[in-house]
Amino acid sequence: MGKEKIHINIVVIGHVDSGKSTTTGHLIYKCGGIDKRTIEKFEKEAQEMGKGSFKYAWVLDKLKAERERGITIDIALWKFETSKYYVTIIDAPGHRDFIKNMITGTSQADCAVLIVAAGTGEFEAGISKNGQTREHALLAFTLGVKQLIVGVNKMDSTEPPYSEARYEEIKKEVSSYIKKIGYNPASVAFVPISGWHGDNMLEPSEKMPWFKGWSVERKEGKAEGKCLIDALDAILPPQRPTDKPLRLPLQDVYKIGGIGTVPVGRVETGLLKPGMVVNFAPVNLVTEVKSVEMHHEALTEAMPGDNVGFNVKNVSVKELRRGYVAGDSKNNPPRGAADFTAQVIVLNHPGQIANGYTPVLDCHTAHIACKFSEIKEKCDRRTGKTTETEPKAIKSGDAAIIVLVPSKPLCVESFQEFPPLGRFAVRDMRQTVAVGVIKSVNFKETTSGKVTKAAEKAQKKK
């Protein structure tokens, strides 16, 4: 077997008809986890429904429909391999809760792949003020996805087909607007592709002899290649934050007969080990971890990215809930927030937002109403420079520095220190109206919570 490939996560973004599904479907289809039988079944169904021309997107639609219905489909279907990486597509837009998912995201994307359509009029629609292209790219950047690849899709439908001039025009335009957002175009690979015909997807296309390949420059060195798959191979591997203090937001808490209370969640930073004395914030409950397991196998330690269940002693299911955060009681344990200051970007709110506005925040696994207690300043989104102090109200398109006060105990962190616990979605009227990145947290004075007997024993042993 040799050494296992590194796992990376990508998010595919772009306007609704840019061909994201077809492009993603093509990669999964050609390099992915879908077995031949499933593909043949999909193809047959597609043909019967007269959707023969739609097979790659059809593959994705089938998967998406299953995901929408809440069937946890075989996650392998959303994976594909490059020569260097195992790639997981963590969410493809078009999904209703895409923006929320991207923020509270089960995992941080290492790279965003932006698909823009080259067809006449199509590119312009996607990039116009109300197209989704800008919003998606802005979100990716705001949420710390610093690597970007741009696929200029549907090159087969330009006038004339596979037009170099059209590609160059789009490249120039996209470069200028991703630069406004904060990306450096020199470090972004641009590839002209056809997700449907397969041009420049996995191998260089004869139809675009003018394309000499993409190249990027970044402080980690240069990279170059011919097709989309090479660009994915050139993604810089993520640094998994094992050296930071433990943060594990709880997704669920189970009571398992004969074992006891088992909280479940994903290690975001640090390590979780059996025997560790953990602290659950914001309730400040301290207890010992008896065992840790993943996929029904006992672990000696769980690392960032691992979804685990762990058994805790002398704690009832009622004392823990989704949204609480576990940490190591001996190493900068998590605490509840009295209030926190964040940079908030308003995406789509029909009216004005003023002090006192109290929407629901989705931050990691927590879902809690928070009050905008003080809108301190409006700022330039890209540079962070103040443009107005103490504004009366803010509206769609504005970025502002705001002090928020949670209505119930809540555990959050600054984005700088613990990214997954420092970004949030603001939900109102069943949609994401704003996104935020936490600059600083004013922690509550820790009043000591319950310390279980198991924890006391474990602490004495040490």
Swiss-Prot record:
Location relative to the cell: Cytoplasm
Residue ranges, annotated region (G5): 194-196
Region (G2) location: 70-74
5-glutamyl glycerylphosphorylethanolamine, modified sites: E301, E374
Region (G1): 14-21
Binding site for GTP: 14-21, 91-95, 153-156
GO cellular component term, pick one: eukaryotic translation elongation factor 1 complex
GO process terms (BP): translation; translational elongation
Gene3D superfamilies, A to Z: P-loop containing nucleotide triphosphate hydrolases, Translation factors
Coiled-coil spans in chain: none
This protein's UniProt keywords: Cytoplasm, Elongation factor, GTP-binding, Nucleotide-binding, Phosphoprotein, Protein biosynthesis
Region (G4): 153-156
Pfam families: GTP-eEF1A_C, GTP_EFTU, GTP_EFTU_D2
Region called G3, residue ranges: 91-94
GO molecular function, one term: GTPase activity
All residue ranges annotated as the tr-type G domain in the record: 5-242
Family label: Belongs to the TRAFAC class translation factor GTPase superfamily. Classic translation factor GTPase family. EF-Tu/EF-1A subfamily.
Function: This protein promotes the GTP-dependent binding of aminoacyl-tRNA to the A-site of ribosomes during protein biosynthesis.
Name of the protein this chain belongs to: Elongation factor 1-alpha 2
Species: Drosophila melanogaster (Fruit fly)
Lineage: Eukaryota, Metazoa, Ecdysozoa, Arthropoda, Hexapoda
